[in-house]
Each structure stands twice: as C-alpha cells, then as structure tokens.
C-alpha cells in the first residue's frame, strides 16, 4: 500500500510538472464551485457532482464544472442547478486506499447533499456525477440512498471510475441503464489499479457526452 501511495503521489506530481497550465487557462479555472442548492436555488434539474482527488473547489475543473456547463447548454441554464460535494469530502488522496476507495465522512457528506435536494427542491429531478475518487463517493452514496430519494436520481455519470472493476461497471442497487461509465483509453484506475496516467486527466473532453446522456434521462 505504501508503494502504491508513493506511486500515486509521484504520478500526480509528474503529470502536473509535464503539463503546466497557461496563465489564461488558470484564470478561467478559478470558477470551480457550484452551490445552487445551498443558496436555495431550485430548478427542474439538479446536478450533484463529486470532484476528483486534489481538485479545488467543490466541483473541480476537470469534469465537474465542464459537465455542469455542458448540461446547462443542453437543457438551458434556466433549467439546471448545480451543486458540488464539499464540506467533509476534502478530496484528499489517502481515502482512495480504503476498501470503498473513499471514506465514510465523504459518503455521509454526499448523502446529505442528496437529502438537501430532496427536501429543498422536492419537484426537481436529480442527476449526478463523479470523477476519480468522486466516482467512488457517488457509487457508495447512491447505492445506499433510501428509495424515496434514489427514485428521483434519473441518471449518473462516472468519469475515471475507480470502482469500475470491483462493481462491474455499475452502481450496485441502481439501474445500470441509468448509469454511464466513461473511462478513457489508458486510464488504469478503471481496471482496478490506483496508478494515475495522463489519460486520467482528459475527461474535460467527455463533458458534452456526459451532459447529453444526463439530458436524455430527464424531461424539462
């Protein structure tokens, strides 16, 4: 486990150094939070997203905010509210090595966001997504939601699904046809390892695909 942890940290550092973010792009990525639910905004569709390990904000820049923006483009911004999972979900590296590929505090935090959507926006349809460790957070959370909430979750997208092998490409106790797993060629976390390759950082490219899937699962 220590060797894997070291390899994961080294890989993150190597990829970051090899691909420095230009200043204009870095500026654009400052918008990495979405708190519509917390701010009391209810719209026909609510997207709940859990970011990947080490990402800043509560949505992250690689898959979370791009998916939120693409879904707003697909359905109209007036129809989509976005909420990231923050708080106790700190997106730190160590929980990846636990049996659930995340920790219980993160799962409880995400569960609370789904409960918030259910109580504050009872007429909204819920869609969800997660990237990297965030995909494990969503997997573990959604499978144990009470049916009254789970039945409102119309679709889920999982990018770089760290439990893809363990859970056979699906979320247990949730309809497979309502789940889209997006795994890039060469992303080794999708085949049961925690080795980070450059492919694991490419999911911004898949945000439109993910948004189209989620849009097809709801009616507005």
UniProtKB/Swiss-Prot annotation:
Name used for this protein in its record: Probable cutinase 5
Keyword entries, A-Z: Disulfide bond, Hydrolase, Secreted, Serine esterase, Signal
Site (Transition state stabilizer): 53, 133
Cellular component aspect of the GO annotation: extracellular region
Family: Belongs to the cutinase family.
Signal peptide: 1-18
Principal location: secreted
A Pfam short name: Cutinase
Function per UniProt: Catalyzes the hydrolysis of complex carboxylic polyesters found in the cell wall of plants. Degrades cutin, a macromolecule that forms the structure of the plant cuticle.
Origin species: Aspergillus terreus (strain NIH 2624 / FGSC A1156)
Any one GO BP annotation for this protein: carbohydrate catabolic process
